[in-house]
């Protein structure tokens, strides 16, 4: 009897230890990126771009010359950037600190200074590019194509980000360039079909609700990136063909990096949203 009891007791202790190890493992994985999934709404703060020797970190932009590739170039050198021979332009956070997801950060009125410098400074600080400041905004109606587009959205699955940034627009030298991913529909031709995320979305610059009926979700590949659920550190990267202007046929390469801050899609002071 003593041997049987000891055997049973030993097996019981082993089972308890195994269960404890299983729970501990589950607890560790719950804090990691593998279990994180769903839509992310709030502010994606930008880390300013920095350079250390040949290493670039933080947020940055570069432009691929026609027939080049985002990985190998050749890249268009920006005469106002000292980084890697001008082939990388460092970005800094704007007045909102970064990219708002679930709403818009539209181009202000006016959108340019008398010298053609962009005044879009909510997402990123306007940055010098060939003697003129360029900025970025997200708009319910794309400034270049005049197409209605959806508000930015980001989804995480197992530490990987997929983002709709169709509304992303760059402004420079009194000119507008859609730099979204997926790409906004062209100015001419049929509207690319898409399903709006919400009937209305808040504009953090204009401080009002904007309609999203019949807004396009764009065409082509989305922005992609990484997300660490523990630290909330993220990266987002995409490419977008430049159409029109002096850089027609070039491709913009955007890299955003920083920390995600969950928050509502509109401020608490916003009036109630109505569908009409």
Where are each of the predicted segments found?
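N-terminal segment immediately downstream of the Sec signal-peptide cleavage site
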Residues: 30-97, 238-264
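Extracellularly exposed regions in secreted/surface proteins, prominently low-complexity, repeat-rich
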Residues: 209-218, 223-276
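Composition-driven, intrinsically disordered low-complexity tracts enriched in small residues
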Residues: 29-38, 44-45, 191-206, 267-276
């Amino acid at each position: 009897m003593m041997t049987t009891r000891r055997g049973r007791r030993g097996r019981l202790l082993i089972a308890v230890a195994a269960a404890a190890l299983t729970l501990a493992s589950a607890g560790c994985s719950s804090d990691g990126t593998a279990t994180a999934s769903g839509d992310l709404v709030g502010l994606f703060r930008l880390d300013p771009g920095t350079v250390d020797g040949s290493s670039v970190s933080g947020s940055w932009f570069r432009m691929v010359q026609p027939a080049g590739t985002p990985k190998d170039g050749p890249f268009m050198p920006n005469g106002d950037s000292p980084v890697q021979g001008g082939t990388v332009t460092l970005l800094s956070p704007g007045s909102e600190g970064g990219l708002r997801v679930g709403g818009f950060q539209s181009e202000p009125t006016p959108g340019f200074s008398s010298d053609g410098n962009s005044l879009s400074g909510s997402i990123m600080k306007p940055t010098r590019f060939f003697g003129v400041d360029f900025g970025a905004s997200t708009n319910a109606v794309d400034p270049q194509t005049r197409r209605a587009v959806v508000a930015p959205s980001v989804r995480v699955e197992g530490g990987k980000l997929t983002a709709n940034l169709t509304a992303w627009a760059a402004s420079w030298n009194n000119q507008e360039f859609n730099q979204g991913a997926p790409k906004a529909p062209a100015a001419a031709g049929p509207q690319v079909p898409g399903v709006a995320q919400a009937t209305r979305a808040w504009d953090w610059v204009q401080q009002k609700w904007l309609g999203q009926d019949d807004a396009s979700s764009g065409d082509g590949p989305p922005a992609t990136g990484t997300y660490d659920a523990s630290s909330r550190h993220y990266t987002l990267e995409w490419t977008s063909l430049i159409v029109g202007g002096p850089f027609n046929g070039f491709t913009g390469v955007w890299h955003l990096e920083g920390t995600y801050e969950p928050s509502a899609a509109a401020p608490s002071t916003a009036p109630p949203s109505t569908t009409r």
